[in-house]
A protein has these predicted regions:
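Core catalytic lobe of class I
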Residues: 1-288, 298
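PRPP-dependent phosphoribosyltransferase catalytic core
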Residues: 291-304
């Protein structure tokens, strides 16, 4: 007797207005062809371009503005990771208006766009400011990046809850008079140049399976780092650039931080087996960054 297999083949899923619970042979073409996407930058199917950087330029921090990065060839950087100065009269900031501040960032990020390879990524850590009124910096940056032609890949919420005091509240105490929200998060905005993907070629990935599954979630939870420990008014923890470097670069790639401050992104790139290039206008912070990198390099040589 011939037995017939009556199991039905699963149909592929499609993106709808209310999402899709699974991803089986998923077809999202009709969704991305909808009018919702008409005015947004589109992925360009262009030839991959990558130009080499002089060896003497690699693994160096320049004490100058990143508004003009003539030391770098166009199409040479694989990843930008940065946290722009917050412009709240911290000692290294100028007192810029909001429009002047946005203009500065746009100038730097336009220059960064030129320096990124096809499919290169730009990751921007930003905190919103103020309460009277609240300034949604991350929204302004997204608007400006899209206007420049960057493709937005998503945003990560950095939950700093463990760094917040559980016994502190702002505004009217136990009253609807004027309760004030306390930000316990920052944003990490993720963009690409021209293409969402990069070809690996002979390069190696270095991210572990468990980390990939965890870090591709849109909420990351780890504490902030003390300014007193680092010696810089607004440092981010090494965990932040480490995750981005592991997710978005291959071993040996080049990481740029155009506002490198104390050099955390540069130091982390070195630890992760990548090259780095940094820029900062404050000589004291360039000195601090180089000192941190030197101490790590000396320690690594000693261990060998």
């Amino acid at each position: 007797m011939i037995q017939t297999n009556h199991r039905k083949r699963k149909n592929g899923t499609k993106t709808s207005s209310f999402g899709s619970p699974g991803r089986i042979g998923h077809d999202s073409s009709s969704f991305y062809a909808s009018r919702l996407y008409e005015e947004l930058p589109k992925e360009n199917h262009v030839k991959y371009i990558e130009n080499p950087i002089l060896v003497e330029t690699l693994d160096k921090i320049f004490c100058k503005s990143s508004e003009h990065m003539e030391e770098l060839p166009d199409n040479s950087i694989h990843l930008m990771v940065t946290s722009p100065p917050y412009n709240v009269k911290k000692e290294y900031d100028e007192d810029l208006s909001l429009n002047e501040y946005r203009t500065l960032l746009k100038t730097v990020f336009k220059e960064t766009y030129k320096k990124l390879v096809t499919g290169g990524r730009a990751c921007i850590n930003v905190a919103n400011l103020g309460r009277k009124p609240y300034i949604p910096l991350h929204s302004y940056i997204i608007e400006d990046m899209l206007e420049m032609g960057f493709l937005m890949r998503g945003e990560i919420i950095w939950n700093k809850a463990s760094s917040a005091s559980p016994s502190t509240a702002w505004g009217s105490w136990l009253s609807a008079g004027n309760p004030v929200l306390r930000d316990i998060h920052e944003y990490i905005l993720i963009f690409s140049k021209e293409s969402f993907s990069r070809k690996r070629g002979s390069k190696k990935d270095t991210i572990a399976k468990e980390d990939f599954l965890e870090w591709t979630k849109s909420v990351w939870t780890f504490p902030a780092v003390s300014a007193r420990i680092i010696g810089h008014p607004a440092p981010f923890p090494e965990e932040l650039p480490h995750r981005l470097i592991q997710l978005y670069t291959f071993k040996g790639d080049i990481v740029l931080d155009p506002f490198c401050g104390s050099g955390t992104a540069c130091l982390t790139a070195l630890k992760d087996g990548r090259h780095y290039i940094g820029y900062d206008i404050e000589s004291a912070y360039v000195k601090l960054a180089n000192q941190r990198i030197k101490e790590y390099s000396n320690h690594r040589r000693y261990q060998k």
